[in-house]
Amino acid sequence: FSFNTLNLRLGKATGDTLNSAIRAKIEELKSEDRIGTMQFFKCTLVMVEEVGGKDIPFSAITVEWLQKCEKLWSKTRSVSTIGMHMRNIRTLMNEAKRAGVIKESQYPFGKGLFEIKTSIGRKKGLTKKQLKAIFDYKSENETTNRYKDLWIFIYLCNGINPTDMLKLKFSDIVDGEICFVRQKTERTTKNRKEIRATISVQMQAVIDKWGNKPLSDNYIFPYMKGNETAIEAKAITRDVVKRINKRMKLIGEELGIGNITTYTARHSYATV
């Protein structure tokens, strides 16, 4: 993303506004199939326009203006959500500063200026005892068992992101290990790292019960076809996560554990 790209895409007549910069960023992310981030920047655009309208010059982005945003947004949004949108704004302000659109003295973020608040997140990992209760849990409802098993697979497969799980193919299995690169890091050479997860007996049981036929070109799980657009794939993933979370919430309540989500599985892998 650059302001040269912005000017070419939107034309200099639009002027240097936060709105046009966000729209350019959205187009860039869409072209890179980074749909989740694209949708988040769309939300940022809606939120800043709630406060400043459709034509917000970069010169208007002051400490006071950001404080006004924070105060308004805090009525309906969490500290962590506000923080993520503020970081989107900061990203574009950094680009504006580098491009000479704003002066250093106009930059509103930093110590003694506007500081983005961070929430103190409670730990969402489960204990070994709680995990055992989930593993041992059996329902009379087949759908509940299906999504519980997918949750277990996420946990056992190194806390795999559901996006990555649904893209796994049988060709990703090499010598008893599942090998994959996290979607969030595959575009960067610096952080790009292949993850290997040994297929345990329990993981294999989940694959055998709920997976596709074990052919090299097949996805392991029957959700993606391979011809989806990035937006369609994102929608499928969101739907599967929603279904897992719905069933795991019921299981958590029944076991007295509380709300359980796919994030709980991922965090538990990292902490247990």
Task: Locate each region found by the language model.
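N-terminal DNA-binding module of tyrosine recombinases/phage integrases
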Residues: 1-46
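N-terminal core-binding DNA-recognition domain of tyrosine recombinases/integrases
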Residues: 23-36, 45-122, 136-137
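Short, basic/aromatic-rich helical patch in the C-terminal catalytic core of site-specific tyrosine
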Residues: 66, 89, 153-154, 158, ...
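Basic, Lys/Arg- and aromatic-enriched nucleic-acid-binding interface segment
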Residues: 83, 106-162, 166
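Short, charged phosphate-coordinating catalytic segments
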Residues: 94-104, 154-177
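Conserved tyrosine-mediated DNA breakage-rejoining catalytic core shared by Y-recombinases
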Residues: 111-112, 167-209
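Major-groove DNA-contacting interfaces characterized by cationic-aromatic clusters
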Residues: 119-120, 204-246
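Short, basic (Lys/Arg/His-rich) helix/loop patches that form interaction surfaces
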Residues: 242-272
